Amino acid sequence: MGKGKNKMHEPKNGRPQRGANGHSSRQNHRRMEMKYDNSEKMKFPVKLAMWDFDHCDPKRCSGKKLERLGLIKSLRVGQKFQGIVVSPNGKGVVCPDDLEIVEQHGASVVECSWARLEEVPFNKIGGKHERLLPYLVAANQVNYGRPWRLNCVEALAACFAIVGRMDWASELLSHFSWGMGFLELNKELLEIYQQCTDCDSVKRAEEEWLQKLEKETQERKSRAKEEDIWMMGNINRRGNGSQSDTSESEENSEQSDLEGNNQCIEYDSLGNAIRIDNMKSREAQSEESEDEESGSKENGEPLSYDPLGNLIR
């Protein structure tokens, strides 16, 4: 082989280099893949960032998916963020007054597991504008229906929705099959927060909403108790029970009467019922008639009596 014969050179005319078999070279394929990946990355109107602690499954992590799409940037521990930092370590809640900060500097989140918050070095991350999120319900596949258990994309979307940028919230959530369900699930509550101004007003709205939920829960419990009491004290059921008792007693009495009557009944050879008391009375009558006949005659001869009624033979 000659020296440098297998060395790959960049074509001068800009066309993809082909091998002896007419196919493009492997190096050209790699170059095209990198170009395709860069073209697929999206841009968001404001800066998005996260501190990723690899607590979640990469296939189900919403933050990692946003990173693959090129929508969010991963920060190192020790780096600070100038925009809104949605963090469990925040002091106040996100409010509509934060709109200017969001539009100028963006928003960031902490990508970690709710069960491993104690492992997160909050003193080494964050920024000047750390915020909590008010009461909202998760719609993601892991914590659906659970309050405050939002994942990364839900937290960012909630921040944008509260400050009034529903378009940004919808754009982020559109990359997830369940994403728009988050806005539908919290529609009424987000509209309430959007009508507030500062952090205190959002906090009051949150407390009023929680009191409303508590009241509805107590009402449901009281209604359930009343329904249980009504079922236990149903008059119709009691009446049916007494009627059944009386009917049973009547049946028992009738059965006892029949049994008593059966004791006085016998059957002849043809299966006809014969009452014993009637039979006995008939036998007694026949015996009396026989006695009378025997009294009127004895051995075919008439009987005579003295004046005192004694039989004279």
Swiss-Prot record:
Changing R131A: Decreased aminocarboxypropyltransferase activity. Residues 247-257 have a biased composition (Acidic residues). One of its GO terms (molecular function) is S-adenosyl-L-methionine binding. S-adenosyl-L-methionine binds at S62, V110, L133, W148. Changing S62D: Decreased S-adenosyl-L-methionine-binding. Residues 237-246 have a biased composition (Polar residues). Residues 215-228 have a biased composition (Basic and acidic residues). GO terms for biological process: enzyme-directed rRNA pseudouridine synthesis; maturation of SSU-rRNA. Residues 1-30, 215-313 are annotated as: Disordered. Changing K65A: Decreased aminocarboxypropyltransferase activity. It is an enzyme of class 2 (transferase). Pfam families: Fer4_RLI, Ribo_biogen_C. Transmembrane segments: none annotated. It catalyses: an N(1)-methylpseudouridine in rRNA + S-adenosyl-L-methionine = N(1)-methyl-N(3)-[(3S)-3-amino-3-carboxypropyl]pseudouridine in rRNA + S-methyl-5'-thioadenosine + H(+); N(1)-methylpseudouridine(1191) in yeast 18S rRNA + S-adenosyl-L-methionine = N(1)-methyl-N(3)-[(3S)-3-amino-3-carboxypropyl]pseudouridine(1191) in yeast 18S rRNA + S-methyl-5'-thioadenosine + H(+). GO terms for cellular component: cytoplasm; nucleus; peroxisome. It comes from the Eukaryota. Aminocarboxypropyltransferase that catalyzes the aminocarboxypropyl transfer on pseudouridine at position 1191 (Psi1191) in 18S rRNA. It constitutes the last step in biosynthesis of the hypermodified N1-methyl-N3-(3-amino-3-carboxypropyl) pseudouridine (m1acp3-Psi) conserved in eukaryotic 18S rRNA. Required for processing 35S pre-rRNA at site D. Present with 3610 molecules/cell in log phase SD medium. This is 18S rRNA aminocarboxypropyltransferase. It comes from Saccharomyces cerevisiae (strain ATCC 204508 / S288c) (Baker's yeast).
